Amino acid sequence: MFEEVQVLIVGAGAAGIAAACRLLEQGLENVTVFEAGDRIGGRVHTVEFADNVIELGAEYVHGERGNISHELASRHNLLEGSKILTKNENWIFADSQGEIIPREQSTELLNIYHGIYAVMPNKLTDFEGSFGEYFTQEYFKAFKENPFTNFTRAEEFLEWIRRYECIIDSCDSWSEVCASGLAEYWICPGNPLLNWKGRGYKTLFEVLMNKFTPEANELPLLEKVHFKKVVSSIDYSSENQIIIKTTDNLERNADHVIFTPSLGVLKEQHNNLFTPPLSELKKRTIQGLGFGTVDKIIFEFPYKWWPEDVAGFNVVWSKEDKTKFLQSLDKGNEWLAEVFHFSTVDHQPRVLSGWLTGPCAKHVENLADSIVLDGFYDILQRFFSKNFNIPKPINMIRSKWNQDKNFRGSYSLRTLESKKLDVWAKDLAEPIINPTGKPVISLLYRYHLIVISKNETNHFLQILLFGGEATNEHYYSTVHGAVESGIREADRLIDYYRKRKSQL
């Protein structure tokens, strides 16, 4: 059925790997993967560090039911819930005078936060403004009913939540996040913080390759991947085959192309990448959907200086102290006032992970490692040294997702601009017609950009599919959303050829 079918997959991230493995599993052997970098995984990036491995990209499997990553991993008992991260009472908050905030206050704050989230899906759909407006409104409603601290401290806590939400949504500001657009996102029920028992998220790809399934043959995925192949053009104007060119002057023809690079790459390159160009509607969709930067800065300490029951550390500025602090800084160091959160890392007893997002993260990507390490350490000292003897980190590793031309950011979001432009995932279902009147491009509802060119002689379709987390209506920004997209697009090809064979 598949002997002469040529499929080229652009990108060896979660979507590309999932698509390739599905096709190989079903007997389509003529699969080629062009990967611009020197590794598989994309925004899943597991590296050795300190006593084990850490994740520079995706870290946890979020939820169980409806989560394809959980479904795949649980067959082999590869996941476990975090021991302490999900317990609100295990998070320490300190104010800008270096005093630990009473745990009953910080615990109640997190209870309110999660309480707002629990009922949020039913309230967001008809909210006209930003998610920042929505959450602020709901937060002060909850505070009025339960004044768990004084009003000034409540405002300071809200500022901490704002920064935390910018990490969750990968946004520069929660004022740009569309509340009604956020309603599209589906939360998978079950434990939201499942780790890989010290193996790292890269284990998911081993599962996809059947390495944990003794009764199945291991799929030869890595034999199909060509590294450092940067695609420079995809020409689908011909009625015969799609022509793909790379920056090192390699040219390859294919019957089908599955395009899986990030929305950040699309934003930067789509005008020069596709022939013919994408329609104005598709361009507006790429423009309207957001794609932000979230970076991790991970520190190794010579020993564990925090108690066993501590999940992480959070900093809460007063307006007055923050103003004075900013005035004391040299120009270019304002980013220090945006450091707010350090979390422990499962299976890494001497490691803390700091987070930055938005313009601040992009700025810090350009700073020297020594400046970043010293800056984070100074914040830890300022807020927590009254209560803990904090040694200086002995090692640091960090992500630079915006700086990397193969990603240009971390993950996607729904913005107010997308609402203003009236562009949503459903627009991916609308066809684009070429000058001859034949349907050459259509976008699959909920998932992927598909380019279809009919071959009158051979009576089969050439299809260019866009996969990846940003193409998923309900599970965008997640690995399981990316994996699902790759599998569904592979299944689209498989289903087509099965139907075609049945008609012969």
What is each model feature region?
Residues 1-504:
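FAD-dinucleotide binding site
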